[in-house]
């Protein structure tokens, strides 16, 4: 992969010429964790994560909020991806680190960053080279035999798969709210078809594989039911991050956060820049189900 010069007086840092077109999702957890090791410590002589936050347009109060988190660098990058899905690129991150004078980070992490980007671009190239199929057919064919017959109405031999309008991401303690959602969206004039894990998914298969299959290939949208209990759920965390990792151009349209209870904890930072449906707001509650339904009915 081609590299570009880093400029006079700069420490070497390999950067493929097209890194400004590579989204931040290409960077894996290893690189993000090591980046935090460099930027999280507050230093008087070197630019830390707060300087990067200012470069990304965060104000004082936003930086103070991130400061309370265990890994502010990781949270900052997640928020950047959510706020600017088209502009949050690896090339832009490296350019900001150069502007901040963090050539040590570029030198130490440059090889790992380039390797992550190569892997990402290879995956995208392989996807582009796949034989073209009719989208409606392609999206309904399970990737492996393990994913045939995973819902109650699937054909066990893979000849027909059940499709849904929305995948509902929720924790067990919010199941009562989900049952109300079923009544309001499925059993009314909206006649939507929701994928509710406890009701629609057959037992006996890997939870993570099923979740990925349903979110990416079987459901047009994903509703995330937000509460304090949601924040404690590893399963909900995986499902949300998986949905956000899908194509940047479609993810904001795909994912709809719903706040179902008053929260003591802070709203998830990775969802902060997506418009929510707030069930707890008495002033807008009468419009709640209609707004949510119409959002799910969009093409």
From Swiss-Prot:
Record's subcellular location: Cytoplasm; Nucleus
Pfam families the record matches: Death, TIR_2
TIR domain mapped to chain residues: 162-296
Annotated tissue distribution: Expressed in spleen, liver, kidney, bursa of Fabricius, lung and brain (at protein level). Expressed in cecum, heart, spleen, liver, kidney, female reproductive tract, thymus, bursa of Fabricius, muscle and lung.
PROSITE patterns reported for this sequence: DEATH_DOMAIN (PS50017), TIR (PS50104)
One Gene Ontology biological process: MyD88-dependent toll-like receptor signaling pathway
GO molecular function: TIR domain binding; Toll-like receptor binding
Taxonomic superkingdom: Eukaryota
Family matches, as CDD domains: Death_MyD88
Coiled coil spans: none
Residues annotated as domain Death: 34-113
GO cellular component, one term: plasma membrane
Classification via InterPro entries: DEATH-like_dom_sf, Death_dom, MyD88_Death, Myelin_different_resp_MyD88, TIR_dom, Toll_tir_struct_dom_sf
Keyword S-adenosyl-L-methionine appears in the UniProt entry: no
Keywords: Cytoplasm, Immunity, Inflammatory response, Innate immunity, Nucleus
Chain spans, region Intermediate domain: 114-158
SUPFAM superfamilies membership: DEATH domain, Toll/Interleukin receptor TIR domain
Domain comment as written in the entry: The intermediate domain (ID) is required for the phosphorylation and activation of IRAK.
Described purpose of this protein according to its UniProt entry: Adapter protein involved in the Toll-like receptor and IL-1 receptor signaling pathway in the innate immune response.
Protein name: Myeloid differentiation primary response protein MyD88
Organism encoding this protein: Gallus gallus (Chicken)
């Amino acid at each position: 992969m081609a590299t570009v010069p880093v400029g006079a007086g700069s420490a070497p840092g390999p950067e493929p010429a097209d890194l400004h077109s590579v989204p931040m999702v290409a960077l894996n957890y290893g690189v993000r964790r090591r980046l935090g090791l460099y930027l999280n410590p507050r230093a008087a002589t070197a630019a830390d994560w707060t300087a990067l936050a200012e470069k990304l347009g965060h104000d004082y109060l936003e930086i103070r909020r991130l400061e309370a988190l265990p890994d502010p660098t990781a949270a900052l990058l997640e928020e950047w991806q959510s706020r600017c899905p088209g502009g949050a690129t690896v090339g832009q991150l490296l350019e900001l680190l150069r502007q901040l004078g963090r050539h040590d980070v570029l030198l130490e992490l440059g090889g790992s960053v380039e390797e992550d980007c190569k892997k990402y671009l290879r995956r995208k190239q392989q996807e582009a080279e796949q034989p073209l199929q009719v989208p409606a057919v392609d999206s309904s064919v399970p990737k492996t035999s393990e994913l045939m017959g995973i819902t109650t109405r699937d054909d066990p031999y893979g000849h027909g798969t059940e499709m849904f309008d929305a995948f509902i991401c929720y924790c067990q303690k919010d199941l009562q709210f989900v049952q109300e959602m079923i009544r309001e969206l499925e059993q009314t004039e909206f006649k939507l078809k929701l994928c509710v894990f406890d009701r629609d998914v057959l037992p006996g298969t890997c939870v993570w594989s099923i979740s990925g299959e349903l979110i990416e290939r079987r459901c047009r949208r994903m509703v995330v039911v937000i509460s304090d209990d949601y924040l404690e759920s590893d399963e909900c965390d995986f499902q949300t991050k998986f949905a956000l990792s899908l194509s940047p151009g479609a993810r904001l349209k795909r994912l709809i956060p719903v706040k179902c209870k008053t929260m003591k904890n802070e709203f998830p930072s990775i969802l902060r820049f997506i418009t929510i449906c707030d069930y707890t707001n008495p002033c807008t509650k009468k419009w709640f189900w209609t707004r949510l339904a119409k959002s799910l009915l969009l093409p």
